[in-house]
């Protein structure tokens, strides 16, 4: 067996309670579509179609299961009592916003699940995983424990993988996972890389902060993860996100920048000090080839970048060169579409652009890149994880049938109070864990 390294996309399967409750402050699309009806079945099938599209391009593709929602255990911890049906009824009557938070399917956005460092970058030669604590938004803070269980179930081999507990919850160590992290290398995933951690604020002050929306990632969280993952300080860069970008709706840096191998595609407003950031990246690359592709405000206004999710596409390496997998909204935005045409016309490392329909996710503020967690693994490490999570033709067909069997095609936030929805979800997840060979990972299955 060769020990080449590959970047694998672990996509979150959209959960049965996918809805538009407008929970995410700072996420413009989430607020815009609040209280509209959603289509969980369509959302899950769109996500599955994206996975299959990437797999057909030759990209290695795997899945992460949804989380159990509504989170009745969380409602119990918050003072609601009785059986599941009674708890849902009381929560719907007394605090429907809290019920919506406990019913969110936001774990579908796997880019926020964790930060992952490949073995090539870690001093101990293992791949490291830290599940994100996501404390800024209550509905997302509920995900960390189950995310940890899922990652430990998939990457169970202790020789190859090291798992760290989520950072302490609170304002100092706010961690939003890989949505604020990218890794560059000099042309091959298996080479030593430069890990770029982008943060929105220093929890101890001293730097300008956004005025309108919260900065979700702290410098302290990023520094802690770099230490936990045994990274060489010479191969780590901490970069502050431009507060203006956050206030414009770029609540994660992957809304305004995306990197892959030796390419960084970024908006001119992405970083607080772009010249210094690029200088440090170029210094790390030295004589090795590096492509920085800046998109100016004149080419694509920041408001268009945020609404089109141009930068929230997936930048992937195919046999024919690098491809950008962008949402349909980027094609439909005149400035973004014009830029992409010009990008392809002038040549360069990005050889093709493909547009994908993930509109149900986009309406909640999650583009193609939000739906996946990038994990770089060697062939040896790939052989050490559960093979049942990789997207094969059989799994693709099986998941499609599973979605059509268990998911509703119309859901309002108020429907989260329906005890039948809870039972439908548990039945679906129980079947899914058997399909994926993950064992008991949910509270209703006895996991703790």
Where are these regions (language model features)?
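The feature marks the mature, well-folded catalytic cores of soluble enzymes
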Residues: 1-448
């Amino acid at each position: 067996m060769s020990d080449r390294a590959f970047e694998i996309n672990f996509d979150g399967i959209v959960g049965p309670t996918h809805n538009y409750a407008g929970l995410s402050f700072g996420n413009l699309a989430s607020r815009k579509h609040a209280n509209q009806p959603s289509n969980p079945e369509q959302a899950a099938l769109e996500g599955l179609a994206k996975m299959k599209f990437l797999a057909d391009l030759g990209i290695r593709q795997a899945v992460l299961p949804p989380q159990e929602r509504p989170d009745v255990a969380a409602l119990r911890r918050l003072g609601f009592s009785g059986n599941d049906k009674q708890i849902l009824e009381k929560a719907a009557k007394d605090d429907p916003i809290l019920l919506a938070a406990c019913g969110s399917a936001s774990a579908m956005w796997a880019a926020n699940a964790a930060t992952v460092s490949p073995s090539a970058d870690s001093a101990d030669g293992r791949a490291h995983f830290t599940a994100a604590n996501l404390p800024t938004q209550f509905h997302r803070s509920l995900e960390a424990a189950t995310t940890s269980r899922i990652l430990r179930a998939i990457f169970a081999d202790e020789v190859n993988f090291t798992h760290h507990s989520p950072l302490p919850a609170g304002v100092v160590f706010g961690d939003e996972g890989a949505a604020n992290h990218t890794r560059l290398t000099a042309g091959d995933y298996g080479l030593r890389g430069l890990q770029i951690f982008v943060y929105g604020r220093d929890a101890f002050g001293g730097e300008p902060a956004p005025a309108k929306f919260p900065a979700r990632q702290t410098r302290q969280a990023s520094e802690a993860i770099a230490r936990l993952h045994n990274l060489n300080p010479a191969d780590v860069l901490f970069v502050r996100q431009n507060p203006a970008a956050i206030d414009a709706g770029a609540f994660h840096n992957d809304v305004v920048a995306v990197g892959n191998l030796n390419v960084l595609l970024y908006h001119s407003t992405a970083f607080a000090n772009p010249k210094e950031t690029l200088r440090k990246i170029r210094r790390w690359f030295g004589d090795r080839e590096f492509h920085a592709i800046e998109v100016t405000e004149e080419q694509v206004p920041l408001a268009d970048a945020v609404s089109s999710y141009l930068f929230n596409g997936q930048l992937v390496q195919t046999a024919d060169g690098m491809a950008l997998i962008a949402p349909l909204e980027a094609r439909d935005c005149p400035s973004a579409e014009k830029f992409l045409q010009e990008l392809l016309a002038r040549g360069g490392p990005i050889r093709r652009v493909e547009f994908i329909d993930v509109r149900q996710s986009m309406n909640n503020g999650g583009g193609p890149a939000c739906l996946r967690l990038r994990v770089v693994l060697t062939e040896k490490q790939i052989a050490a994880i559960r093979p049942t999570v990789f997207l094969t033709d059989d799994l693709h067909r099986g998941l499609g049938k599973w979605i059509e069997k268990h998911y509703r095609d119309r859901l309002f936030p108020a429907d989260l109070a329906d005890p039948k929805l809870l039972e439908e979800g548990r039945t679906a997840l129980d079947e899914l864990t058997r399909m994926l060979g993950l064992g008991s990972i949910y509270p209703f299955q006895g996991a703790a």
